[in-house]
């Protein structure tokens, strides 16, 4: 007999009247009015009390054995949508979900509803109006805060608006924001007497429609406009979220939060940059500690600091995290010249050039981690920093690093600090490990600061998911100029083509003639036999690398001076043998983008490439007498590309109910072989290359997953 059962049997009997009186006293002691809780002063958690007799109601959840919540996700967090009067809500203007607070233990078992507020006001006829084209003008007399979900443009007419570390002032320029709830959503805050406009983003239609091609892009925006009947909602790409009851179903919205220690350090750094415009800051720390978030807040604070001169508002980002880069596609290191605040997520700006930023120089690791070739990682980082020193030394520099802080990763960080010599090193954790902190502090010549980490409690996308989304977004890009309403806004913005990659005409590149389009294929980390080359690279992501000088091959063994030795496979595909696993010299080469090798036509001897790289760029490189090498390595397998057409043909639209499971932030992301949810609906359509069809409860055999080596081994480990 269990202890619980023993307690129930031995318990002193209580009369029904005594039980009723006890429960009424317990209910009377519970809070009746709205209470304010939370870590932030501007966040309210509203508890609605019930009548005293409601405690006597039997809860179905109590009549059965308690179930252990999966991944610590409490089902009560997903609250039902609440009805809202039309007067208090503008159609096509906002929704979001929130986390529920812990219930009062005195009221455990009672039917309660916990509501978290995200906005300090409601729309009314007095504080807003809807203009032509779905533009919402807000006239706020008091300091307010509110949360907007979706894609929108913001223009300040009077007053100030702050979001994601940026402060926006009256201007004719529209700042464009992408706020999906798979990332932390920024809160908008205003001062007294502020007038602003929220503009629908017509360019967002393409990226929202990527949900038709992959479950990764579904259920991450505001509610589908088609669910509302009003004309305004059909034109809108955003919604204002008032409370957690307004949230889309089955989603957890986390606000972008900056702890007090962060705010203090950010203010100090911005003030220092006024006296020293070339301030350099290196941000490091363990994974999921908030390095990218802090970098984004710092960047936006520098770019919108009003005390700076108008013509000097630019910041250089040295992005050294190949697994989760902010601007360039995954697998690359880049030097980025930024002129506008970063108000979107990485998968909303994966291009190498945009009106808000320009990737000055980029190198490919052909991998999402520096582990395969630490020496190449340091060489690429050194070249990018040298480029900054030669051409952009007068601008502030922010260095973002990967979350690899042990073993070889710690050696790499120490080497980077010694090379860059930043004015300040920020370590985004106060919990060590001591070995890493002491080593980094010793390598730092000037200031070393530890800040508290800010991890996300839950996430609907793992790091592997986000890399896939960023890569998929990159390959669906197309550049265009956009004119919005009557405002002068003709700057180039990103636009996405939501058609499957398999339906597009590929770029045909001859590989066997004397005027072939590429010098050859080059493999990092592993050189397969020539007979297997075609099958090895077909269907994979490759990096297109411009050879600026033949000295780029100086590391390769050569019997004679350059050009390098080029061999051919049985299909006459040219490749550069790399059995010694050496790399191109980054001082004489650069990555111009990524390509997807869709197919190899052995009859016409052409490579079929899908890429957003403009054809003019290829022609410009060839006209200068330079060569292009296609780099093959350990890029993530583009599983999303193989199933796009299947999902589209299955009719799984963006507005369906399939969503990805919410997991903990530190979930193991090494699940590239796991099929996304919703794959069952497309399994019987047709046979597709590189797609394995599993029916029913069928599973892959044991050992079919990719085996990967340990990443934490030291660089100088001899294996003895």
From Swiss-Prot:
A Pfam family that the UniProt record links to this protein: CLP1_P
Single annotated GO MF: ATP binding
Segments of this protein annotated with the region Disordered: 1-91, 663-686, 698-720
UniProt record, GO biological process: cleavage in ITS2 between 5.8S rRNA and LSU-rRNA of tricistronic rRNA transcript (SSU-rRNA, 5.8S rRNA, LSU-rRNA); rRNA processing
InterPro entries registered for this protein in UniProt: Clp1/Grc3, CLP1_P, P-loop_NTPase
Broad class of enzyme this protein falls into: transferase
Binding locations of ATP: 285-292
PANTHER family: CLEAVAGE/POLYADENYLATION FACTOR IA SUBUNIT CLP1P, POLYNUCLEOTIDE 5'-HYDROXYL-KINASE NOL9
Family to which the UniProt record says this protein belongs: Belongs to the Clp1 family. NOL9/GRC3 subfamily.
Protein name, UniProt field: Polynucleotide 5'-hydroxyl-kinase GRC3
Species per Swiss-Prot/TrEMBL record: Gibberella zeae (strain ATCC MYA-4620 / CBS 123657 / FGSC 9075 / NRRL 31084 / PH-1)
Organism taxonomic ancestry: Eukaryota, Fungi, Dikarya, Ascomycota, Pezizomycotina
